[in-house]
Amino acid sequence: MLDIKKIRADFDGVAAKLATRGVEKEKLEKLHDLDIKRRELIVKSEALKAERNSVSDEISQVKRAKGDASAQIAAMQKVSAEIKAIDAELAEIEENLNEIIIMLPNLPHESTPIGADEDDNVEVRRVGQTPTFNFEPKAHWDLGEDLGILDWERGGKVTGSRFLFYKGAGARLERALYNFMLDEHGKEGYTEMITPYMVNQESMFGTGQYPKFKEDTFELKDDRGFVLIPTAEVPLTNYYRGEILDGAELPIKFTAMSPSFRSEAGSAGRDTRGLIRLHQFHKVEMVKFAKPDQSYDELEKMTANAENILQKLGLAYRVVALSTGDMGFSAAKTYDLEVWIPAQNTYREISSCSNCEDFQARRAQIRYRDEEGKVQLLHTLNGSGLAVGRTVAAILENYQNEDGSITVPEVLRPYMGGLEVIK
């Protein structure tokens, strides 16, 4: 959530930055007008309350002197009625103001490329060599079905589209990957967590998924309204919701593997086959809590942590800085890691690493106490390290052999009982 004081102090600057994120200036002008009216009413209400207190003192003095206080009582009743009316108007204005501000995206960092969509993203670097084949590489869904390790047909029968069963070596490969990822992040100082897989709506608000992206989630239809997590970012970030941390302990780093549940609203017709876009998938998440002056260094380190996984798996990838028009709602700056998918002859997203600055911390009220004892908002960061199903897809396609078998990357073999080839 944006700081209303910042909008107030630099309206034109904030409006210009938000325009690059598709926010119309009229919406901000409405917010600005409501804020002015709100402050005027607060001043008026406080003046009337001071007047009421003064009249109350007069009534007490008159009564102590056994005099007639009816005039003062009538005056106080009139003032009280005015205060009640102003406070009611103020409550309505604050509700309208809040409805606007909670739907505004984060301000982009100055280094974030300005653009309308993914076509304006900027490639930062490419790492690794894309493989060459002396045969036509198959898509991962065909490889998985032919090997009997991925079963979409029965996943569809049991649940519906965009669901599948991992079977045998497929299930072992998935498990090997997320155990490998967690171990690697543990070496980098991340504390491993197992989170709840359902959260309350306050948690969804804290990280910015609610209310704007409610249609993208699966929500329990009862009086509790719990939500199946779309990413472990939600429970991990909300772990410290409403708390004040010791600045000496920052940065704090968490990692967790969890299922992620997404309705994929608006994705009809996109990636209808394979592991790229599912309603349920495993993901290893990284979350950091950092001091504001250290958060961008921590973003680079987090991105390097995600890259480390791809490098050790021997997968070619590229790093892309997302444009203002393609970046997530809560992010100020985002790097996407895109892995090479041979059958599609392109790079596909496998990780997003973002610095949300104090945007989520303000929504979730996560603060820290600095060396001087001052309490202030910290910065939150999150990143995929990595999306496990997409990593399975990348391994199947990049490590495929002409006979349809899959060579297991060396770093995963200890996690798979020494298995070298899936066939």
UniProtKB/Swiss-Prot annotation:
GO terms for cellular component: cytoplasm. Catalyzes the attachment of serine to tRNA(Ser). Is also able to aminoacylate tRNA(Sec) with serine, to form the misacylated tRNA L-seryl-tRNA(Sec), which will be further converted into selenocysteinyl-tRNA(Sec). ATP binds at R262, S263, E264, E349, I350, S351, S352. It catalyses: tRNA(Ser) + L-serine + ATP = L-seryl-tRNA(Ser) + AMP + diphosphate + H(+); tRNA(Sec) + L-serine + ATP = L-seryl-tRNA(Sec) + AMP + diphosphate + H(+). Pfam families: Seryl_tRNA_N, tRNA-synt_2b. Keywords: Aminoacyl-tRNA synthetase, ATP-binding, Cytoplasm, Ligase, Nucleotide-binding, Protein biosynthesis. The gene is serS. Pathway: Aminoacyl-tRNA biosynthesis; selenocysteinyl-tRNA(Sec) biosynthesis; L-seryl-tRNA(Sec) from L-serine and tRNA(Sec): step 1/1. It is found in: Cytoplasm. GO terms for molecular function: ATP binding; catalytic activity, acting on a protein; serine-tRNA ligase activity; transferase activity. Belongs to the class-II aminoacyl-tRNA synthetase family. Type-1 seryl-tRNA synthetase subfamily. The keyword ATP-binding applies. GO terms for biological process: selenocysteine biosynthetic process; seryl-tRNA aminoacylation. Consists of two distinct domains, a catalytic core and a N-terminal extension that is involved in tRNA binding. This is Serine--tRNA ligase. L-serine binds at T231, A232, E233, E285, S384. Its EC number is 6.1.1.11. Homodimer. The tRNA molecule binds across the dimer. It is an enzyme of class 6 (ligase).
